[in-house]
């Protein structure tokens, strides 16, 4: 004769004669529901879906239990003594409901025209070591270049957007088609400030032909710093927003990140002659004094402390919200 197991998380039928210490897999704890998350107090797994919660496999082995838990009794309470007795009758496995704290009042959005402050740059040991190696190699390259001013066949043009390479003296007479502006990344769209042909695809952006004509630049001496696009993303926790820029061997002495409560300006020089710029109107408000920048050999992380513990819908404030904010401030 099979019996129904009443252990939480089991619910299977079992044969009492074959019931052993590891026959049942169940939850010895109680259900916990907090901030839309559901789980058991005895294990760490959490889910927002109630069906998933019901299907969470037990975390403890033991005997099947055929004893049905007592139903909660609801007598007509008339005295304090009876209320106390009623509390004792309630099953011990009743779910725990944790009340969330009251929401904080929304902070009034400060003006974007507040003075900008340079965030503290924290340079890692790995970046310092990488820069020391690059310094030695660049010194050796400069000596070689001084010995020979000859341009090697296959040398790419240093102008942004130009894909031509040096094939001989006739290459210097060719017209160079390049982008004279800077790359701009805004609300998922990518374009150059000089021609503003917008696209959401990064490869299409890189393949856009230049909108300006001029002469090719073959050597670093003539090119100087070159503004280039750079992969970057962001993530957040309850109290912090982090922007990651994937630029190798950034130069701390030539780079800076400045911010006020609602604006972020990023200027990174990396790999010797490359530059990355990004200006962001932040979706939320940050605490500038508690924000900083971590610089490593492979990336830069801008850690911004939130002024209020709210989840941001995006990193950047949409244009419509910005205009609405300005209109409200004018009124």
Swiss-Prot record:
Sequence ranges assigned to domain CHORD in this UniProt record: 5-64, 157-216
List, alphabetically, the InterPro entries matched: CHORD_dom, CHRD1, CS_dom, HSP20-like_chaperone
Which residues are listed for Zn(2+) 3 binding in this entry? 157, 162, 176, 216
Name of the protein: Cysteine and histidine-rich domain-containing protein 1
State the encoding gene: CHORDC1
Coiled-coil intervals in this record? Answer: none
- Give the Gene Ontology MF terms in alphabetical order: ADP binding; ATP binding; Hsp90 protein binding; zinc ion binding
Residues recorded as binding Zn(2+) 4, renumbered to this chain, are: 179, 194-195, 211
